[in-house]
Amino acid sequence: MLEVVTSPSLATSSDWSEHGAAVGTLSDREGIAKSAALSVPQLFVKSHPRVPPGQSSTAMAAYGQTQYSTGIQQAPPYTAYPTPAQAYGIPPYSIKTEDSLNHSPSQSGFLSYGPSFSTAPAGQSPYTYPVHSTAGLYQGANGLTNTAGFGSVHQDYPSYPSFSQNQYPQYFSPSYNPPYVPASSLCSSPLSTSTYVLQEAPHNVPSQSSESLAGDYNTHNGPSTPAKEGDTERPHRASDGKLRGRSKRNSDPSPAGDNEIERVFVWDLDETIIIFHSLLTGTFASRYGKDTTTSVRIGLMMEEMIFNLADTHLFFNDLEDCDQIHVDDVSSDDNGQDLSTYNFSTDGFHSTAPGASLCLGTGVHGGVDWMRKLAFRYRRVKEMYNTYRNNVGGLIGAPKRETWLQLRAELEALTDLWLTHSLKALNLINSRPNCVNVLVTTTQLIPALAKVLLYGLGSVFPIENIYSATKTGKESCFERIMQRFGRKAVYIVIGDGVEEEQGAKKHNMPFWRISCHADLEALRHALELEYL
C-alpha cells in the first residue's frame, strides 16, 4: 500500500515563501541554477514497501519543522541598505523635449565623471537613470535592491574591487568649458539688476598695415546674399522694382533674390555712420570738448580727398550735373559695349552736352547716343567701386595711401572711435544671411560713393544698396527700397535727422536715433541679442 507523505517544504510557515524568494533572487542575480533545483519540493514521496514507516521517521524531522538541504543555509534577516549618496558618475543626459526646454540644467557636460565610484555593498546597489515622458525629464530609481546578504559560499565569482577615478584619463583638457552651467554655480537667490556703464574707449588707434583700414573691419568673409553682393543689372527689372527696358548686358543670376531678404536696415551716412559735416563746422569739437582747429583741419583734408577721388576715378566732372538716385537708373540705355579700350575723354560726351541745361533733373537727355555714353560712365563707376571697395589704397596709389591712413587714424582719435563703433553694428547685420544694409544719403551719388570708399565702408555697402536723396528726398528713396525688397520685409531706419525720422514714421518703420556713442553701443548690443 502506498503511503502519501506531505513534504515539510509545503509547511504553512512563512519561512518557505521567504526562503523561496531568496533563492529565486539568487538564481536571477547570480545565475546559480543548481541551488534553485535543490529547493524544489517533492510533492509525492513513494515509500519503499520493505521499509517500515517507522524507519523513515528517523530521516525526517517532526511535522512542522523547517527542513533545509545541505547546500543552502537559512537566510539571515533582511538588511536594509541605504541609497548611496553618490550615484554612478554618469550624469543624466539633457533630453530636449517637445516643449524645447532643457530639463537638466545642472548637467556639467556631455561626458563627466564623479569624484570616485562609491563602494557598493554586497549585491546590486540601486542606481538612478533618467526617465523620459511627455511631461519632461524625471529622475527615477531602479527597483533593484539588495534582498539578502550572501556569503562567499553562495557566490561563484569573487567580489569586484572598487575603481578609483585616477585610472581613467580625462576626455577633455582642464581648460575645457562645459556647455551647460553646473549646479554648483546656479544662484539660489533672486538675480539682481546690474547697471551697465559705458566706458570711454581709449583715443589711441593701433597701428595698421599698409593694406588695412579699407576693409579690415569686415568680419564676414562668406558668400553674401544677392542684395549684398550680386544684385547687379537684371534683364527685365531695375533695382527699384519698376519694369524697364531690357538691357543687353546679362549678369550671372544670383541664387537668391531681393524678395528673400527678411530685414532691411536703412542707414543715414553723415553724423550717423561717419563724422564729416560737423568736423567742418566745428560742431563736433565744441560738443565733445575737442580742439576746433584740429577738427576743421581734418575735415578739410578728408573733403579734399573725397572730391579728388570722385573727380579722378568716378567721373564726377562729367556726372555732377547728371546725378542719379541709383547707379543702375540709366543701365537700360547701356548696349553692353566692351569698355576695356574705350576712351572716355574723346567720346564727345562734353561736346554733346556742354551745359547743365541739357541734363534734366532725372538725368534724361533727348539723344540716344548721349544717354548711352552716360550709361557707360555709370557702368565704369560701378566696376571701379566693386574692384576697389576693399582696397582703396590700390585705387588712390601709394603716395596718397600713406596720407589717407594717417588721416584715418587722426580722425578716429578725434571722434573717439566713432566709425569703429558703427562698423561693429554694420558687420553684425552684414553677417546675417537674410539681413541687408542700405544707405540713403543727401549727398550726391558720386561723392557719396567716394565717402563710402575712403571711410572703409565698401565691405558692408554694395553699390546696389546706395541711394542718393539729393533731388527726390529720403521719403521717395524709402518707397523705392520698399518696392525693391517687398512688403514682407521688416524695415528699420537708423539716423540722426528729422527727415529720415519723418519718412520712417510715414511708412510705419521703426526709427533708431543716433546722437552719441552710447546710441551706437546700444544698437550694437541690441543686434548682438538679436532684438533687431
From Swiss-Prot:
GO terms for biological process: DNA repair; extrinsic apoptotic signaling pathway in absence of ligand; mitochondrial outer membrane permeabilization; striated muscle tissue development. Its cofactor is Mg(2+). Residues 205-224 have a biased composition (Polar residues). Keywords: Activator, Chromatin regulator, Cytoplasm, Developmental protein, DNA damage, DNA repair, Hydrolase, Magnesium, Metal-binding, Nucleus, Protein phosphatase, Transcription, Transcription regulation. Mg(2+) binds at residues 268, 270, 496. InterPro entries: EYA (IPR028472), EYA_dom (IPR006545), EYA_dom_metazoan (IPR042577), EYA_dom_sf (IPR038102), HAD-like_sf (IPR036412). The active site is at residues 268, 270. It catalyses: O-phospho-L-tyrosyl-[protein] + H2O = L-tyrosyl-[protein] + phosphate. Extensively expressed in cranial placodes, branchial arches, CNS and developing eye and nose. Low expression in lung with little or no expression in skin, liver, intestine and kidney. Predominantly expressed in the upper one-third of the oxyntic mucosa and in most regions of the pyloric mucosa. This is Protein phosphatase EYA2. Residues 228-243 have a biased composition (Basic and acidic residues). The lineage of its organism: Eukaryota, Metazoa, Chordata, Craniata, Vertebrata. Probably interacts with SIX2, SIX4 and SIX5. Interacts with DACH2. Interacts with GNAZ and GNAI2; this retains EYA2 in the cytoplasm and prevents its translocation into the nucleus and transcriptional activity. Interacts with SIX1. Interacts with CAPN8. GO terms for cellular component: cytoplasm; cytosol; mitochondrion; nucleus. Belongs to the HAD-like hydrolase superfamily. EYA family. Residues 202-258 are annotated as: Disordered. Disruption phenotype: No visible phenotype. In contrast, mice lacking both Eya1 and Eya2 display complete embryonic lethality, due to severe defects in muscle development, including the absence of the diaphragm, the absence of ventral hypaxial muscles of the trunk and muscles in forelimbs and hindlimbs, similar to the phenotype of mice lacking both Six1 and Six4. While Six1 is normally expressed in these mice, it does not activate transcription from cognate promoter elements, and does not activate transcription of Pax3. Functions both as protein phosphatase and as transcriptional coactivator for SIX1, and probably also for SIX2, SIX4 and SIX5. Tyrosine phosphatase that dephosphorylates 'Tyr-142' of histone H2AX (H2AXY142ph) and promotes efficient DNA repair via the recruitment of DNA repair complexes containing MDC1. 'Tyr-142' phosphorylation of histone H2AX plays a central role in DNA repair and acts as a mark that distinguishes between apoptotic and repair responses to genotoxic stress. Its function as histone phosphatase may contribute to its function in transcription regulation during organogenesis. Binds 1 Mg(2+) ion per subunit. One of its GO terms (molecular function) is histone H2AXY142 phosphatase activity. The keyword Transcription regulation applies. Its EC number is 3.1.3.48. It is found in: Cytoplasm; Nucleus.
